[in-house]
Amino acid sequence: MVKAISSNLGYPRLGEKREWKRALEKFWNGTITEEELLAETKALRLHALKKQQEKGIDLIPVGDFSFYDQVLDTSVTFGIIPKRFQHEGGNVSLNTYFDIARGKNDAVASEMTKWFNTNYHYIVPELADANPKLLNNRALYYYEEAKKELGIEGKPVLVGPITYLKLGKGSNAESFEVLLDKFIPAYIEILEELETAGVEWVQIDEPYLATSFEKKEIALFEKVYQSFQEAVPNLKIELQTYFESLDYYEEVVNLPVAAIGIDFVHDHGDSLQALKTYGFPQDKYLAAGVIDGRNVWRSNLDAKLALLTDIAHYVAKDKLIVQPSNSLLHVPVTKLSEPDLDEVILGGLSFADQKLDEIVILTKALTEGVESVAKELEEARKAVKVLNESSHRNNLEVQAAIANLKNVRVDRELVFAERIKLQHAWLNLPLFPTTTIGSFPQSPEVRKTRADWLKGNITDAEYNAFIEKETARWIKIQEELDIDVLVHGEFERTDMVEYFGQKLAGFQATKFGWVQSYGSRAVRPPLIYGDVAFTEEITVKESVYAQSLTKRPVKGMLTAPVTIINWSFVRDDVPESVVANQVGLALRKEVEALERNGIKVIQVDEPALREGLPLKQARWEKYLNDAVYSFKLTTASVQNDTQIHTHMCYSDFDDIIDTISALDADVISIETSRSHGEIISTFEEVTYDKEIGLGVYDIHSPRVPTVTEIQDNIRRALRAIDAKQFWINPDCGLKTRQEPETIAALQDMIKATKEVRAEYQVLEK
């Protein structure tokens, strides 16, 4: 019997109940030792491997585990340690590893940014003066562990050298190939050790291949993989791409490797078309990513099987590997942890474990015939049909509103230059007004009280009284700090997207649908399963209460449509732009309710706008136009003297600055401190006419910045931005920080602001 091969590309690290997160945080807090951390994480790792083994996955990834991030792991493997961490050679300690990611008092953390167009963050390699040496072969360690403990012949996973270097900073185009030449021998050393240990397959991830780049760069891949092939001829290398199609399909599939991994889900149909046009080398394996590794909806297995049957016309079945489109890092572990979900929605879901089941079903169908999995196919067919046809998915009123969008105003009544005068008149703020981004620390008491409320251990009245008490306490703290524009603190919210999902029709929260965002930070994206509709006021009560406590303006705080889309698991049966407009119409009603109730500064956060950009620049225009439209749909109906703010996270902005301006927000705040001034250079080169706050300190590190550091950041920004346009704020929300460090950092921020403000006022006189 000719057998197709089942494979996985990576498995979630978090654990079914976030055990990985808790272990890390216990270690950071000093409540467990390093040995205990290693033991706890090993147990989690082996449990994940055993599940994949029991499900019948043929090629099980090893080395996809990390204590923080796989890109940081690669840096540490090769000794790419920034000098400020004073590493003196040899294996990198776990404490140094975490210091690079999180910072310490005398050394700022390395920059963190989004992994391609996902909500996962990686630690950016600092490549200046890089001199790679293999310090620790993690891939070999995890391979030997899986073999010894479980008898698994695992498939080690590496971040490929070109992708790794492209993700780094501190090198330039002229020196790239010189730098690459330094890394090739270090990678070969890893591969030689793997080959010697008896490894059959190794997966080398090169998602850079799925981006847009100049064709001449293909020569770099030819050079690297030819070097690998010559050094380890007995090792089967799977060159793995994902998140998009290949611009240079014909060249990539002819690279000197044993297998090419291609995304057949997020490729807009390009991959199958390329296969039909150019064929596929008969001596290679095609690893077909046909199960969506980035969303949670059950696959239409009939359609997937038809796709694989098409592919099998060009690739022999024994050379066909069935796998997810990308690592399952981006989805929760198992839907079996969600017994309380509505059965129609639950039936339509597929988390990591269920996706592995789907892969095994499809592989068996290819090998043994459709009849061998007839029962499983029928079950999937029925579940998808029931969800698609259910009232859960279809709201006729919402569909009518979407059809009527041409009659809805999406522009502010006055242009910015006119309405900002009206806003200044009543706000009466000083030069360099100060604010924060939205959330304040959620202490153990906040989390425990919310948990008690959710369990029914305290009444609604008791919970609301606690939230009001915490809100009042932080309004007072902000006034004592002398912050100009206040926030209510968001103590009622677990997450800036999940909270809205709990209040809007068409959303469903999960209990354990957690995915890793960065480090130990996990998010629980809501499920957008149906048409989205406004059903009740979402933020009005808390905002109005906070405003009643102070004469200073308090910002209403909402999350914008594209961020809600990008940070949710969105239904896959209608275009995302339609869902974004449904969200925009619902939030428009919330914005109007805030304004009606006296909230005249409203922040509509769009932190994920750039991360959702398609990897192919040719697809940008539609995405950005859709994003601007849904944002303006949310905000355009307010009065001219109501000030609209927005906030954006880790991003490169130089190529979307026109889009940012087109959002027509009166004030934008941007996360900038970890990029060490790179974003500021964007504003040195363009004229931005609206008001702007560039984050003056990094909130992702527990380190408290000095007044001098903050002043340096302010002054650097003021070289590019007119003082009258400039706001001062932290990089991002402060929910994950501890209270003492938060207050200390804000004190430094206000002190720094007042000193710089005084300097400018003297200059003006």
UniProtKB/Swiss-Prot annotation:
Its cofactor is Zn(2+). One of its GO terms (molecular function) is zinc ion binding. Pathway: Amino-acid biosynthesis; L-methionine biosynthesis via de novo pathway; L-methionine from L-homocysteine (MetE route): step 1/1. 5-methyltetrahydropteroyltri-L-glutamate binds at residues 18-21, 114, 567, 611. Its EC number is 2.1.1.14. It catalyses: 5-methyltetrahydropteroyltri-L-glutamate + L-homocysteine = tetrahydropteroyltri-L-glutamate + L-methionine. L-methionine binds at residues 437-439, 490, 605. The keyword Transmembrane helix does not apply. InterPro entries: Cbl-indep_Met_Synth_N, Cobalamin-indep_Met_synthase, Met_Synth_C/arc, UROD/MetE-like_sf. The keyword Ribonucleoprotein does not apply. CDD domains: CIMS_C_terminal_like, CIMS_N_terminal_like. L-homocysteine binds at residues 437-439, 490, 605. The active site is at 700 (proton donor). Keywords: Amino-acid biosynthesis, Metal-binding, Methionine biosynthesis, Methyltransferase, Repeat, Transferase, Zinc. It is an enzyme of class 2 (transferase). Catalyzes the transfer of a methyl group from 5-methyltetrahydrofolate to homocysteine resulting in methionine formation. Belongs to the vitamin-B12 independent methionine synthase family. This is 5-methyltetrahydropteroyltriglutamate--homocysteine methyltransferase. It comes from Listeria welshimeri serovar 6b (strain ATCC 35897 / DSM 20650 / CCUG 15529 / CIP 8149 / NCTC 11857 / SLCC 5334 / V8). The gene is metE.
